[in-house]
């Protein structure tokens, strides 16, 4: 009897789930129909405004009233997407004339729940609405949203700030994150800074000016941002790497920077790291082995060959990769292949086999193409 009750209960739960899914399908379809209906109505209105070549005060008031509702804003988003695909320049010009509308809406959406509050900055970022025009009310509101415990609200507010291109507001946003108890993934911050639309040189100077006051985590974010954005910081990055006691994570980022952007004065520092760390700090050694790719020369090849005998697999792997990137031939590695270290020989054979396979694939593609 108990087994039958459990089976009936299970069937009832399954039936309830199926019923719930069916209801959700109808609700979502009805919602999509409403959005499409609203969007078509907005398309007619916007096209008429574009034809008249004038955004009137009445049109701004109409949008200010309508777009306070999230469904209308979503429909307006669909409208702009469709029209932007047809004529980007016209829509950019149209959006530029709507700054008063979006300034007003910034304050309205600040009062709404987290999901709606996150959606509005997304629209600002998506259409670059305030780019180059950091209106104080807008920037203050976006900075307040960066305090939010919700990751979605914070990230969308940050993306909106980056898209506007205000150096001062971007620095303020970083300080909010720096002092916040809410975790924000460092990679997301780095990637966001790469989207900054303003004066990147001025931003870089401001970041260096305040660098020492930031937390270690934020300092690493800044160094990573420089690594992906500009070769103009080599001297400062080297100076950051040189002192004793520098945080390991920051040091790793500095080494990667100097590996991407070759800087001759950094070479003795990099080789010194390998000499000091190869027997007890494999992460330093592995990262530096990769960095030496951009420092070709006999000394570099000798160092990398020596690292092929390192007991750590990651060090050997990176050293072999760098040797191949330096353009070595099979004959250059005879001493390794004929040596007593089986692991060193194996990893280099793997590299050369991999190279042959890629060459064969490229040849096959070349022969098959017309």
PLM ranges: what are they?
Residues 138-213, 217-225:
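Glycine- and small hydrophobic-enriched segments that form the cores of compact globular domains
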Residues 112-113, 149-151, 181-185, 214-215, ...:
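Short inter-helical turns and helix N-cap capping residues of alpha-solenoid HEAT/ARM repeat scaffolds
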Residues 1-40:
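N-terminal signal-anchor transmembrane alpha helix of single-pass membrane proteins
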Residues 78, 86-96, 118-131, 155-164, ...:
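Structural detector for internal amphipathic alpha-helices that build alpha-solenoid repeat scaffolds
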Residues 46-47, 77, 106-110, 142-143, ...:
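Amphipathic alpha-helical repeat scaffolds
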Residues 26-114:
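N-terminal topogenic membrane-targeting module
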Residues 63-64, 96-109, 132-145, 167-178, ...:
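Amphipathic alpha-helical scaffolding segments comprising HEAT/armadillo-like alpha-solenoid repeats
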Residues 329-370:
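Eukaryotic acidic, Ser/Thr-rich intrinsically disordered low-complexity regions
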């Amino acid at each position: 009897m108990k087994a039958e009750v459990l089976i009936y209960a299970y069937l009832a739960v399954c039936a309830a789930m199926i019923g719930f899914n069916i209801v959700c399908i109808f609700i979502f379809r009805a919602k999509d129909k409403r959005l499409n209906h609203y969007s078509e109505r907005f398309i007619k209105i916007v096209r008429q405004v574009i034809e008249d070549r004038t955004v009137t005060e009445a049109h701004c008031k109409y949008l200010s009233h309508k777009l306070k509702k999230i469904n209308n804003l979503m429909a307006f988003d669909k409208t702009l997407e469709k029209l932007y695909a047809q004529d980007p320049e016209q829509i950019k010009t149209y959006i530029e004339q709507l700054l008063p509308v979006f300034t007003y809406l910034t304050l309205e959406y600040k009062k709404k729940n987290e999901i709606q509050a996150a959606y509005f900055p997304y629209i600002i970022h998506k259409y670059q609405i305030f780019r180059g025009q950091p209106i104080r009310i807008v920037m203050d509101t976006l900075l307040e949203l960066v305090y939010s415990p919700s990751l979605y609200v914070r990230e969308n507010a940050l993306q909106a700030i980056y898209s506007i291109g205000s150096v001062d507001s971007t620095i303020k946003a970083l300080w909010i994150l720096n002092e916040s108890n809410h975790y924000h993934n460092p990679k997301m911050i780095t990637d966001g800074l790469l989207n900054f639309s303003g004066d990147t040189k001025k931003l870089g100077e401001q970041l260096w000016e305040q660098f020492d006051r930031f937390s270690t985590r934020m300092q690493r974010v800044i160094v990573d941002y420089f690594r992906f954005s500009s070769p103009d910081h080599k001297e400062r990055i080297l100076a950051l790497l040189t002192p004793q006691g520098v945080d390991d994570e920051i040091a790793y980022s500095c080494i990667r920077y100097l590996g991407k952007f070759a800087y001759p004065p950094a070479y003795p520092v990099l080789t010194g790291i390998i000499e000091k760390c190869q027997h007890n700090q494999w992460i330093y050694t592995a990262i530096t082995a990769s960095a030496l790719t951009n420092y070709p020369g006999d000394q570099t090849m000798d160092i990398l060959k020596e690292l092929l005998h390192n007991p750590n697999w990651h060090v050997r792997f990176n050293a072999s990769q760098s040797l191949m990137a330096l353009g070595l031939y099979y004959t250059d590695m005879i001493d390794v292949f004929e040596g007593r270290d089986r692991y060193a020989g194996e990893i280099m054979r793997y590299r050369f086999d991999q190279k042959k396979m890629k060459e064969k694939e490229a040849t096959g593609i070349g022969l098959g193409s017309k």
